[in-house]
Amino acid sequence: MDGVVIKNTGSQYLVRCTDGTELYCMAKGNLRLKGIRSTNPVAVGDRVEIVPASQDGQPAYIKRIHPRRNYIIRRASNLSKESHILGANLDAAVLVCTINDPVTTTVFIDRFLATAEAYRVPVILAFNKIDCYTQEDRLQLDRLSAVYTAIGYPCCHVSAITGEGLPDLKSLLDGKLTLLAGHSGVGKSSLINALIPHADLRTGAISQAHHTGMHTTTFSQMIDFPDLSPGSALIDTPGIKGFGTLEMGEYEVSHYFPEIFAASKGCRFGNCTHTHEPGCAVLEALRRGEIAESRYISYLSILEDENAERYRPEY
């Protein structure tokens, strides 16, 4: 029997079967996809083959994971060589960002975007809590939106509290399985409650001491839109503190920064790393202001990930 994983509680997986029934399943101990060292062998969005519970008390279990169309993956933790898969078989991803309380850095944004580019997952940036922004915050919001829209990433300015911008965001999610990700405290749960009122997710507060969010979502789950096309759903994920990249070779990192990759076609050397080489068209474009300095800094930070000891958790 086949189905789709719609919830991961850590010890069990809720699978929606092709006949519409939902079953909690265990994962076989040797269940791993070839070539992936993951802390979670099964991810929400995975298409799986399951064996139902037997009459002799054997619980239902996941026998096989079907090949993934794509996924979003990150380094599991500091100095770790293992990965954590946030979601699989995605049509899109929404990265929820905030200018303040907590701050979403451009390095964090760009690491997420580069990973999504690597696995061909289109990303929408949703800047939340705009009802709380000061004039200075608004200026920063406009600066960031200008950078990312110029590259080709849609930017939505939204408020889960007032509802501003939500219709535009929701229209981009119609007919899609969309991963929702971001730091703890950026308002992911509040945003889902505003987009899908029946979701009724628990929301949390910001730590005033550290200006960071406190986890309210502890497991990943798929939530259907009742008022959009069939197949429209969000995957809610726990807050991410840092985003370490994986599986990116030194000479391919630039491929996942569209504006850097476009400029690199003019480089003198085919193996240019865009850091110091003579005749580097990327460095020239950077000097002319055609590439944002923040994006280039993020590019350099991913190059450093080859040395795991230099991974910095604030990303």
Swiss-Prot record:
The residues listed in the UniProt record as binding GTP, with positions renumbered to this chain, are 128-131, 182-190
Q: Which subcellular locations apply to this protein?
A: Cytoplasm
Q: Which InterPro entries match?
A: G_CP_dom (IPR030378), NA-bd_OB-fold (IPR012340), P-loop_NTPase (IPR027417), Ribosome_biogen_GTPase_RsgA (IPR004881), RsgA_GTPase_dom (IPR010914), RsgA_N (IPR031944)
Query: Could you cite one Gene Ontology molecular function of this protein?
Result: rRNA binding
Residue positions annotated to bind Zn(2+) are: 267, 272, 274, 280
Q: What class of enzyme is it?
A: hydrolase
Q: Which GO terms describe its biological process?
A: ribosomal small subunit biogenesis
The note describing how and how many cofactors are bound reads: Binds 1 zinc ion per subunit.
- Respond yes or no to whether keyword Transferase is given for this record: no
Superkingdom of source: Bacteria
> According to its UniProt record, which cofactors does this protein need?
Zn(2+)
> An example Gene Ontology cellular component term from the record?
cytoplasm
Q: Where in this chain does the record put each CP-type G domain?
A: 79-243
Which cysteines does the record link by disulfide bonds?
A: none
Q: Which HAMAP family match?
A: GTPase_RsgA
- Function of the molecule: One of several proteins that assist in the late maturation steps of the functional core of the 30S ribosomal subunit. Helps release RbfA from mature subunits. May play a role in the assembly of ribosomal proteins into the subunit. Circularly permuted GTPase that catalyzes slow GTP hydrolysis, GTPase activity is stimulated by the 30S ribosomal subunit.
Q: Which family does it belong to?
A: Belongs to the TRAFAC class YlqF/YawG GTPase family. RsgA subfamily.
Q: How does it assemble?
A: Monomer. Associates with 30S ribosomal subunit, binds 16S rRNA.
Name of the protein:
Small ribosomal subunit biogenesis GTPase RsgA
- Encoded by which gene? rsgA
